[in-house]
Amino acid sequence: MLCLRWCNPFLGQAGWLICFWHTFYYLLHHENMIRKIIYGVYAILGMMTMAACSGQSDASEISLEKMHGFPTENTGFLKGVSALYAGVIEGNLLIAGGCNFPDIPVADGGKKAYYRDIYIAPLSNDTAFEWKKIGQLPQAAAYGVTISTEKGLICVGGTTATHSLSDVFLLSLQKDTLKRETLPSLPVTMDNMAGALVGHSLYIVGGNVNGIPSSAMYMLDLSDLSGGWKRETDIPGEPRVQPVCVAQDGKLYVWGGFAPAVEGHQASLSVDGYMYSPETKEWS
């Protein structure tokens, strides 16, 4: 069981420094030199995360626990999948699609398999999930973006075994029945991107655009779908495949990402981050 708990989010900056030094002191006296360095970095990152979370004054306890149970209908799926569409809908955890190498590992030349099934599991205080298949994606796909909204989960783009996607649709539950509503398609195909919701505006950033690593950003106003997707200001720096994106206080934040080598451009790894203001349409 993996379990990480801290019970007082009000320690403040000094409190987190004390926690950090206690953790680092323990590592120095109980691990060999290589592990000291590695765990020391983990400790710093962990305490930074705790400090960031400490501003949530409505939380008295934060916990991370290992959950058990996985859909069993597909034997290949049982080996674990990555890059699936996922989110919480009507008190249920929903997962859809995804991919893996079910037979031969990628290092040995295995072929990647993509999945189509959609499963839900009720959220409870138990650490075991009870999954139920409730539908299928239009096609087996992975590496898209899933955004939780009041109406359901919006699935954007992604890729199949043969091609990238521009499809956008809303998944919702109505009397335990899965419904799928088509939304305006992206003007390009996109996969391995990130996204977040700022107010009624859905932003999709980075990834592969028409098969090429990109720093582009697109926005869809969910309160006016007739306007379709609009191109917004590109993220500064190099193209960003698989970046991290989050919305906070009316702003959009993007970190990291990479870009493989393509004709005319060397491979790159982005270790910086930027904040986007929808009001000024500028990054800083």
Residues covered by each model-derived region:
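Intrinsic-disorder-associated, low-complexity terminal segments enriched in Asp/Asn/His/Tyr and depleted
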Residues: 8, 22-32
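Residue-identity detector for glycine
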Residues: 12-15, 40, 46
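Short, low-complexity segments with poor structural confidence in diverse proteins
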Residues: 25-26, 42, 188
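C-terminal motif of bacterial Sec signal peptides marking the signal peptidase cleavage site
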Residues: 51-52
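Bacterial N-terminal signal peptides that target proteins for export
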Residues: 32-41
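Basic polycationic patches enriched in arginine
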Residues: 3-5, 35
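Kelch-like beta-propeller repeat domains
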Residues: 57-284
